[in-house]
Amino acid sequence: MTKIIAELCQNHNGDKNLMSDMVAAAAEAGVDYVKIQSMQSKDLTKRPRFERGLIESDITKVIKRPFRTEYNRLRKLDLSLENQNYFIELCIKYKVKPMTTVFSLNRIKELDKLNFDTFKVASFDCSSYKLIEQLAKTKKNLIISTGGTYLREIKETAEILKKLKKKFTFLHCISIYPTPLKEANLNRIELLKKFTKTVGISDHSSPEKNGNDLSLAAILYGAKIIERHFTILKKDKTRDGVVSVNFNQLKTLVSQSKENIISIKKRFKKKKMY
């Protein structure tokens, strides 16, 4: 059965009450995991490519996020350890598994003491081998996104984890927001299966334009985990609204993901997509 991750990302806007409502809504929708990001603004580093950004043929290839502007924005979204523990308690209350993305080596020790079920590595850290090694030494489950990563880097990460005898999941990911279906490259899922038994997808397609089509197609390619950004706010009230599903869309995804493969294929044949 395919597992669903509701990614709160920055959609909680640093508001504990909003975060609480989001966890409750995600649980009601039937997800398996709810995820936050343990990002701290003071851990940010200046990266020249984010100062400029890159847009080609009206598609955002590199998000423009200048350091100072991003620092001032993220500072309002910082989650203290107390707030992260509150998030975990909410997940336990609503019977979903708490999960977080870890960005910094110096945060691993303190986060490992909290009752997160799973740690995630963001796409741009798939080749951060020291971070990977240290996370592998924890007892948390490990999921790694692979967007924008070279095959040699994916292979190196897999080899490190296998040497450490750490089970892990790779998520196929296209770091274009939103991801056009023609850019989805789902064959990559088959490639990732060569490195680990469990693979999935971090779906950044547009819910308004494409519904759950990309996530469901990924299941046909063998995805066992689907991650989607989630919001309960209007799309224009959150930075990630364009790639975030709302409650009804998330609930539909959970329901559709439980269909058998034959039913999913029939759904695509009606749309002449499979």
Q: At which residue positions do the language-model features occur?
A:
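Catalytic cores and adjacent flexible loops of soluble metabolic enzymes
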Residues: 1-274
